[in-house]
Amino acid sequence: MKRTFQPSVLKRNRSHGFRARMATKNGRQVLARRRAKGRARLSVSK
């Protein structure tokens, strides 16, 4: 059986990367929440 997680750095960054987050209003809200929480990493790419 094929596993469901087939890693790809490109797909990962395009959907969850910093620039993808900054591109939409809701994405910026995600970053703001993570900053407020004090996350060391705001997104997978940065």
From Swiss-Prot:
Quick check: keyword Hydrolase in the entry? Answer: no
In terms of Gene3D superfamilies, this protein maps to:
1.10.287.3980
Q: What UniProt keywords apply to this chain's record, in alphabetical order?
A: Ribonucleoprotein, Ribosomal protein
Biological processes per GO annotation: translation
Q: Which Pfam families match?
A: Ribosomal_L34 (PF00468)
One GO CC term, this protein = ribonucleoprotein complex
A single GO molecular-function term is: structural constituent of ribosome
Give the matching NCBIfam families: rpmH_bact
Concerning its family, UniProt says: Belongs to the bacterial ribosomal protein bL34 family.
The protein's name = Large ribosomal subunit protein bL34
